[in-house]
């Protein structure tokens, strides 16, 4: 009689333990490496990933833009860095030229373009360059559906812009791009500041600086923003599934200690309430890179000054009296009703929803789309139409 074959459960469990031990070792090693400032910066900016490889910045046509529509320019910053940038003509200005125009046509029409058409000042996210195909599609949408010019820069250390990116350095780059537009003859009220992902922190800081200087510009658009780098670390999930900080959060106080090693802040949440212009915050609900809850937090920070506060008794909840619980509940109900009365919600079938309110005399909008992911949300025609109706008049589009 043959002997039955029994599974080697002990061997299987041993292999599983080894796999988890290796994964734990790799995780611990990655966590330790990310406390090193040089490695931390490279992971955050990913500027060494210069996609597309061998980009032809002096020939934008090779990346999908129309012949003679884009000027490849250089912008000098206050700390003597030179930034590569593209200035792309609006369709109205471009279509007034004979086709095909000479290669230098866009450069010759910059002053005319910025005085006759609105301009989108665009700040891209981490990694890659201004020539990335997704970004080029975004420019094309802005120049056609918004009929606006576009100025897109590569920060220091990105693309053909030499240097090393830093939080303060990117802020100087943004201000240099703004100053360049104004020097070409653009009116501040004709400039719409748009940022995507990492670029939302750059756009927010520039917008706050301009607001504090009393400059009235057209507005600010934050596409797929994060509230702060600290919060992003807490909420980031690999492939949208595996929470990066979960093992660390299981150790008391370990997360706080770890985040103390972060050398970058990019804290938009702490400054966004200083903006005094129309604001559009937009996010795709299927964004696996940055959760759309970050946009909720930014929108709530803008709404907070207009809501009644909620006061808690200065003792532990276990010691609250029935009366104190009742008063606390009443405050919550009053706050919820105040929020509902301030907000106007618009549901757009098969697309998403918008919440809007008027703060400090300006319209604040939160747009959530059902699709678009992290990188493509700005290329959606519906998103560009929301930007159009939020910031542009019919006269702007003629």
Which role does the model predict for each range below?
Residues 165-168, 179-194:
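Gly/Ser-rich "nucleophile elbow"/oxyanion-hole loop immediately N-terminal to the catalytic nucleophile
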Residues 2-67:
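N-terminal membrane-anchoring alpha-helices
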Residues 193-195, 221-223, 282:
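Short beta-strand immediately N-terminal to the catalytic nucleophile in serine-hydrolase-like folds
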Residues 205-271, 288:
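Hydrolase active-site cap/lid region
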Residues 289-292, 296, 307-398:
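C-terminal catalytic histidine-bearing segment of alpha/beta-hydrolase fold enzymes
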Residues 78-178:
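Membrane-embedded segments
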Residues 195-199, 203:
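Gly/Ala-rich beta-loop-alpha elbow adjacent to hydrolase catalytic centers
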Residues 274-276, 281-283, 287:
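Short beta-strand/loop motif that positions the catalytic acidic residue
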């Amino acid at each position: 009689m043959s002997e039955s074959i029994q599974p080697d459960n002990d061997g299987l469990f041993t292999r599983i333990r080894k796999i988890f031990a290796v994964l734990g070792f790799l995780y611990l090693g990655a966590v330790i490496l990310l406390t090193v400032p040089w490695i931390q910066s490279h992971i955050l900016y990913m500027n060494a990933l210069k996609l597309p490889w061998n980009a032809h910045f002096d020939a934008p046509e090779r990346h999908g833009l129309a012949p003679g529509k884009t000027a490849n320019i250089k912008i000098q910053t206050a700390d003597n860095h030179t930034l590569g940038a593209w200035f792309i003509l609006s369709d109205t200005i471009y279509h007034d030229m004979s086709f095909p125009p000479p290669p230098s046509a866009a450069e010759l029409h910059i002053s005319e373009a910025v005085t006759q058409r609105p301009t989108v000042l665009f700040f891209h996210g981490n990694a890659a360059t201004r020539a990335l195909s997704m970004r080029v599609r975004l420019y094309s949408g802005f120049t056609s559906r918004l009929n606006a010019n576009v100025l897109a820069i590569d920060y220091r250390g990105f693309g053909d812009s030499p240097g090393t990116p830093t939080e303060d350095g990117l802020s100087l780059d943004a201000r240099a791009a703004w100053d360049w537009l104004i020097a070409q003859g653009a009116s501040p009220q004709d400039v719409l500041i748009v940022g995507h992902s990492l670029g939302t922190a750059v756009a927010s800081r520039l917008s706050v600086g301009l607001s504090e200087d009393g400059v009235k510009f057209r507005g600010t658009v934050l596409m797929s923003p994060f509230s702060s780098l600290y919060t992003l670390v807490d909420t980031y999930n690999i492939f949208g599934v595996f929470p990066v900080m979960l093992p660390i959060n299981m150790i008391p106080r370990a997360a706080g200690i770890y985040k103390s090693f972060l050398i970058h802040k990019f804290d938009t949440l702490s400054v966004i309430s200083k903006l005094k212009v129309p604001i559009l915050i937009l996010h795709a609900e299927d964004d696996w890179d940055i959760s759309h809850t970050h946009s909720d937090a930014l929108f709530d920070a803008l709404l907070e000054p207009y809501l009644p506060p909620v006061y808690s008794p200065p003792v532990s909840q276990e010691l609250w009296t029935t009366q104190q619980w009742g008063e606390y509940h009443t405050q919550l109900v009053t706050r919820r009703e105040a929020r509902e009365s301030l907000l106007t919600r618009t549901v757009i079938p098969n697309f998403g929803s918008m919440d809007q309110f008027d703060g400090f005399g300006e319209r604040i909008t939160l747009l959530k789309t059902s699709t678009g992911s992290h990188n493509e949300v700005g290329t959606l025609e519906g998103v560009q139409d929301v930007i159009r109706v939020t910031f542009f008049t019919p006269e702007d589009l003629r």
